[in-house]
Amino acid sequence: MYPFSFDPSSKLPVTGIYNILLFNLFPLATYLVETFCFFRRWKIACTLLCSITVILAYRMCAVYHHVGYKDVSTFGLAYGFLIMMSLRTCFLSWRDMVPSRNDPVQISAVKRRRPFIRNARWNFVDYALSLRKYGWTDDVVPPYCRKVLTYKSLGIRTAVYVGAFCFVNCFKTRLSNWMLLPISANPWYIQVAFCVTSGFFSYLFINALYYLFAIIFVPLGIWDIAEYPLMMGNVSKTTSVNDFWSRDWHVCTKPYFRVIAWDPTIALTGSKFLASCSCFFLSALFHDFAYWSISGRCSPAFFFQLLIQPFLINLEKRIPLLRKYHYWVLIIEMLINGTYGMGVVLLKFKWKTCSQI
């Protein structure tokens, strides 16, 4: 099963605009029906539809694998995220935790922006569109206290991240054209610089895309502005490994990790360390979806990079002296991410200029 038994030869090329739309929209349609069954408390139907959604999203990576080295990583991320959404809905269904809106002001704003949602019968549509589920309560995810951004601040952040992304992209392109192939023929500091640049490239791309969706979807009423938390927060103020992963990075996916990984592991073992390991393992699978469709196999770099984090958190708790230095965690994360993490994965699987490596 994914990702270890994926056969690169089992490609599913899709031709024709109608077939492409059918393959892309069918997993989304089954998830919407699953959400409908969730609000009707039909557990068996919800479980069956969850299985169908996961299988369809899983196969979509094989569909896109035939594209080769083209930039289709966003599709892998989208379907990996859809799998987590579907699994979370199924888990909540069996725990009888059907959510509801908990903010009267937000309820009225949603109904004003989405006039087709007039009563509770259409809650499943609103819940499916609210990807991060903020503004909902299901007695599982603790309230997340955050600063709600204004639309002006969203626009400013979008411009900053897009500009920084373009600058790093130009630098990366010049560096990749100047480097020798294979990469091992270059000095070690050039290799590290290129991998670290790759990590920044991915970081800025994700942030720019996130805020671009914000300035488009908020005016259209698809998502409420209160549902947009800060993406990775203010990393410069991060003081510990735990802060980086639990507050800055996983702020958008924490509701899914808690329901699918944290709570079941705590119930079975009672160990917070094992629960943390299960969350990072799930995160590694989710990130691996982005490049599995391109490479045709999983990357051990993701699993090493993420599964080492619980040990760093545990080490930090045992050695209080480490918490006094605010930037050591950022240095460690950058080195791990750049030398044997996202940078290596991007280097091997993403850019056509280095596809021969």
Swiss-Prot record:
Record field: transmembrane: 13-33, 44-64, 72-92, 148-168, 181-201, 203-223, 266-286, 293-313, 327-347
Main location: mitochondrion
Entries under InterPro entries matching the protein: Wax_synthase_dom (IPR032805)
Signal peptide: none
Subcellular location: Mitochondrion membrane
GO aspect biological process, one term: lipid metabolic process
GO cellular component, one term: mitochondrion
GO molecular function, one term: O-acyltransferase activity
Protein's membrane topology: Multi-pass membrane protein
Keywords, ordered alphabetically: Membrane, Mitochondrion, Transmembrane, Transmembrane helix
Protein name according to UniProt: Uncharacterized membrane protein C3H7.05c
